[in-house]
Curated annotation (Swiss-Prot):
It comes from Pseudomonas paraeruginosa (strain DSM 24068 / PA7) (Pseudomonas aeruginosa (strain PA7)). This is Bifunctional uridylyltransferase/uridylyl-removing enzyme. Residues 1-342 are annotated as: Uridylyltransferase. It catalyses: [protein-PII]-L-tyrosine + UTP = [protein-PII]-uridylyl-L-tyrosine + diphosphate; [protein-PII]-uridylyl-L-tyrosine + H2O = [protein-PII]-L-tyrosine + UMP + H(+). One of its GO terms (molecular function) is phosphoric diester hydrolase activity.
Length: 900
């Protein structure tokens, strides 16, 4: 513990303060406030963090001793005040709990009831956050035997007041010879760690990690030390060096990593003003500045700070794996004779774990640094890597240099891993964990731990990349065919599956360099393929996939797939069925690996539609594209056949169709045209809007809910409709607006419920939506109030200036208004209100929400059904939209852009 430090706590001054005051509470509070201020100032000036948290524990010791002495415990009383847990280790952060054990020799607590109650009340009154228990030595033993948490807490203890003999007796009766022998304790702690990691999705790379509990956090270091304490009776990292579980460099790395996390945790407590171990968005920017990071042209300060954080916790995880594996080999020796199974002259299995046959294997044959992972892919029964071999891998990474990277033995081994029938993701992840992957591919090393400060990308770039490969592997499993029917079918017939894994590995490799990462990554991918002797066609395919990996998703979500020109342009880009197949599968995996919430039934259906229409265009031949008239004729013929079968008069149908215009038949399928036509012809002419609701497809995982509205047109129709849908808690994904020559509107909205799923076959919910929309449209003057829902906490920290762009589509005679803005509750309804104010009509809309941002496209016309031609009107419209969308934003606005 620290030496006496009068600046932190001066006993003489404190006693004088007590003598001057009638109540001790003020003196105690002043002393606590004083040492907190001094320690926080020392932290801000960069003082050693280990000393700071030890000093804080020492200060609390002084306060507790002074408080304890104010009560009469009797002469030679068998009662002691014991510090346990983190405080027992002598470590205390600004708002950490002060964990105390009041330890008695006897279970008869009655004689001490009054002073104990007075003591604890005083601690409460002076503002100390304490966690306390009152137990006898025997009770400690009973509870420790039954509870892993209790035995762990009691292992870390020291006496603050009273006889230390009580603590010694307690340690004796709870020692490993009496309970929780090291084997049992190790198994329980390992299981506890596995459960804790699972709670955080088994990744160090959560967007808002818990500095204490997430994988690679402080608890992982403490777990190692607890295991060591139970086995060896030692409780510090240097003891692990003496016992041969760590080498000095690893010990130093763990110690420096621990100190980094301590500084982060200390800063979190200071900024939050309370105990806070979550590195929330609220604090990430502030801590980045506190740690001296600044924005530059390529990365934000917060991204650079978080990359440092992620690399630290990844290093801790790597060493935690190594040490826990080493403990397992020592603490859990196999009761059966050791089973040795040779694999080749370099590797063998020992009780199911792979190890080198000689300590100099990697030095003599460096290619074995890659071979070990290929062997594990070929032998999926291998449980893992022996601890000594993990250390040899770590210590031999320097052997991977340019000569190594261009050696045909090594390039062949790496490609062989991608051709494995299983284990690709698992072993790439191992390569990353042991530092081999980033060493072999320096471009991959640059993206390790690199985050993107948004809600769209919830993983670091390297974690996302490996998740993508994991998802590609999952698509091969039969059980995935239900959720991903098309992708599962396609991936099975890819001629060279290894190419899509290579493209997946490289698709985001150039993130964080500035510039277009797709273009830069394509160059890197081409260089990789060439250095690994891939044929020209394979090289060109991989490079093309990396360059275009975003195109299919962007086309599906932002363009009108009913437009034959959109399909033709995309078909020209892909060129053939093989490129289309590879790109579709890569796109599905990329979306799922970016953020699981992004993949919903509507996005799935859009991608399927784009894939299917493009496949049809390729089969027809790019030299023979479908023209608009042919598509309209095909749709009408198929719809009419269906209507006639249902008893609808052909003349009535054609009379209705004559009022609709070409766009209607281009934007809807024959089935939808028949559905709409039959319902309209049978709908009573009483002014009540017609509202139809059905699923877009019967495929469970590739669907949205289609709401069709037929009613007399009115200038506020879109605004009223989207506001009503907002009130009904519906998320609009797509809108198609048609106005007939008879001034009726035929609007189709694709919606999802708040949970991201389609409405489904829920009669009560369907009735609620239908009635709500009819009521709103029958009473448009009672414009639905936009619901003022609370902006989620996370969204508040990703505010940016809205961007509004207006251009003209001369072919379709509409203005294209693009909005990029922070996502907010009721945002689409707000936009609809602005359109109403400017007397604008919406012809079509594509809605996309990407994490914390929306990227919406509206095809609009003015009151004369013409594109917006007045520059002044466009500027006023932009200004109104930016002002509305900037509410609750907290950021200055950016310039907008008009392209005529």
């Amino acid at each position: 513990m620290p030496q006496v430090d009068p600046e932190l706590f001066d006993r003489g001054q404190f006693q004088a303060e007590l003598a001057l005051k009638s109540s001790p509470i003020a003196a105690f509070k002043k002393a606590i406030r004083q040492f907190r201020e001094v320690l926080d100032n020392r932290f801000n000036s960069g003082r050693d963090i280990r000393r700071l948290i030890e000093d804080r524990a020492w200060c609390v010791d002084q306060v507790l001793q002074q408080a304890w002495q104010r009560f009469d415990w009797g002469d030679d009383a068998d009662i002691a005040l014991i510090a346990v847990g983190g405080y027992g280790r002598g470590e205390l952060h600004p708002y950490s709990d002060v964990d105390l054990l009041i330890l008695l020799d006897s279970e008869d607590q009655e004689s001490f009831r009054e002073p104990i109650e007075g003591f604890l009340t005083l601690l409460w009154d002076i503002g100390l956050e304490v966690g306390q228990s009152v137990r006898s030595v025997r009770q400690c033993a009973e509870e420790a035997r039954a509870d892993l948490t209790v035995i762990t807490t009691l292992m870390e203890c020291r006496t603050i007041c009273g006889p230390d003999s009580l603590r010694q007796r307690m340690l004796e009766v709870t020692g490993s010879t009496r309970m929780w022998p090291s084997k049992e304790f190790f198994l329980a702690k390992r299981h506890e760690q596995q459960r804790r990691h699972a709670k955080y999705n088994d990744t160090e790379y959560n967007l808002e990690p818990n500095v204490k509990g997430s994988p690679g956090g402080l608890r992982d270091i403490q777990t190692i030390l607890w295991m060591a304490r139970r086995q060896f009776g030692s409780l510090n990292l240097h003891a692990l060096v003496r016992e041969g579980f760590l080498v000095e460099s690893e010990c130093s790395m763990l110690a420096s990593s621990q100190e980094f996390l301590w500084r982060v945790r200390y800063a979190l407590h200071m900024l939050a003003g309370r105990a806070e171990d979550r590195l929330l968005f609220d604090h990430q920017r502030s801590i980045a500045r506190l740690f001296g990071y600044e924005d530059n042209d390529v990365k934000l300060a917060v991204e650079r700070f978080m990359q440092k954080y992620y690399r630290v916790v990844m290093a801790i995880s790597e060493l935690n794996d190594l040490i826990v594996q080493h403990f397992e080999e020592v603490i859990l020796p196999c009761e059966q004779p050791v089973q040795i199974q040779p694999l080749n002259s370099r590797f063998q299995l020992r009780d199911g774990y792979i190890e080198v046959t000689h300590p100099n294997v990697f030095k003599r044959t460096p290619f074995a640094l890659l071979e070990i992972f290929v062997l594990m892919a070929q032998h999926p029964e291998i449980k893992g890597v022996r601890a000594d071999t993990i250390r040899l891998l770590r210590d031999s990474r320097h052997l991977i240099d340019d000569e190594f990277r261009h050696d045909i033995r090594n390039t062949s081994l790496f490609i062989e891993l991608f051709k494995s029938s299983q284990g690709i993701h698992r072993n790439l992840r191992r390569m990353n964990r042991y530092g081999i992957l980033g060493r072999y591919l320096p471009e991959f090393g640059h993206i390790i731990g690199q985050m993107q400060h948004d809600l769209f990308h919830i993983y670091t770039v390297d974690a996302h990349t490996l998740n993508l490969i994991k998802h590609l592997r999952k698509l091969n499993r039969p059980e995935m065919a239900e959720k991903y029917p098309l992708a599962s079918k396609i991936i099975d017939r890819l001629p060279k599956p290894e190419l899509i894994y290579i493209a997946g590995l490289y698709h985001d490799i150039a993130k964080g360099r500035g510039g277009d990462h797709s273009e830069l990554g394509a160059v890197d991918a081409e260089a990789f393929c060439q250095s690994h002797q891939l044929p020209l066609w394979d090289t060109q395919l991989v490079s093309w996939l990396v360059q275009n990996h975003l195109v299919m998703s962007t086309t599906a979500q932002r363009k009108d797939l009913s437009d034959p020109q959109v399909i033709f342009d995309f078909a020209q880009l892909v060129g053939d069925q093989t490129h289309l197949d590879y790109l579709y599968v890569l796109t599905v995996a990329d979306i799922n690996a970016t953020n699981p919430t992004l993949w919903n039934s509507w996005r799935a259906s859009l991608l399927r539609q784009l894939y299917t229409e493009t496949k049809r265009a390729l089969r027809r031949g790019l030299e023979n594209p479908v023209d608009r008239e042919e598509q309209i004729r095909q749709t009408q013929t198929a719809a009419l056949d269906q209507l006639v079968r249902n008893g609808i008069d052909q003349d009535d149908a054609e009379q209705l169709w004559s009022q609709l215009g070409d766009d209607y038949f281009l934007r809807h399928t024959a089935g939808d045209v028949a559905w709409h036509t039959e319902a309209i012809l049978q709908h009573p002419d009483d002014g009540t809007p017609l509202v139809l609701i059905k699923e877009t497809t019967q495929r469970e995982f590739e669907s949205g809910s289609q709401i069709f509205i037929y009613a007399a047109d009115q200038h506020d129709f879109f605004a009223v409709t989207v506001a009503a849908m907002d009130q009904l808690n519906l998320s609009i994904q797509d809108a198609r607006i048609i106005t007939s020559t008879s001034q009726f509107t035929l609007d189709t909205y694709i919606v999802l419920d708040a949970d991201g799923d389609s409405i489904g076959n829920n009669p009560e919910r369907i009735a609620e939506i239908r009635e709500g929309l009819i009521d709103a449209l029958k009473n448009p003057d009672d414009y639905p109030t936009i619901i003022q829902r609370r902006v989620p906490r996370q969204l508040k920290h990703f505010a940016f200036a809205p961007q509004v762009t207006i251009s003209t589509d001369a072919l379709r005679q509409v203005s294209v208004l693009e909005v990029i803005a922070p996502d907010r509750p009721g945002l689409l309804a707000r936009i609809g209100g602005i359109f109403l104010d400017f007397d604008l009509s919406v012809q079509n809309a594509k809605i996309a929400t990407l994490g914390e941002r929306v990227e919406d496209v509206f095809y609009i016309t003015d009151a004369r059904n013409q594109p917006l031609a007045d520059p002044d009107l466009c500027k006023r419209l932009q200004a109104a939209l930016v002002e509305q969308l900037s509410q609750d934003n907290g950021r200055d606005t950016l310039p907008t852009r008009i392209n005529f």
